[in-house]
Amino acid sequence: MVQRLVYRSRHSYATKSNQHRIVKTPGGKLTYQTTKKRASGPKCPVTGKRIQGIPHLRPTEYKRSRLSRNRRTVNRAYGGVLSGSAVRERIIRAFLVEEQKIVKKVLKLQKAKEKVAPK
């Protein structure tokens, strides 16, 4: 006769958060063991890519006590938050915006000089 199994917790619905596996104990009994959800790891909010160099853990495992800082982040601007390509894109965009401001300023000065020169 097969041994009957009963959930160890009161949560009795077969949902994603209530997944179990059957395990045989050293005493020879079969019991349910709660399985953890698989971690997908952090994603870049801009590109949607996985962030390289950071382990795939559940959100609670990223807390200070469980993971050291150098394992939680990547050593660059926006490290651990944005992917490398997104950071590169931001830097280039910021540089081009600054260049555009400088060009505008120079053109304004040249226009002012032209107005003053004919008089």
Curated annotation (Swiss-Prot):
CC annotations in GO: cytosolic large ribosomal subunit; mitochondrion; plant-type vacuole
Give the region (Disordered) as residue ranges. 30-51
Any one Gene Ontology MF annotation carried by this entry is: structural constituent of ribosome
Keywords linked to the UniProt accession:
Ribonucleoprotein, Ribosomal protein
Annotated S-S bridges: none
Q: Which terms does the UniProt entry file under GO BP?
A: translation
The similarity annotation says: Belongs to the eukaryotic ribosomal protein eL34 family.
Q: What is this protein called?
A: Large ribosomal subunit protein eL34y
Taxonomic source organism: Arabidopsis thaliana (Mouse-ear cress)
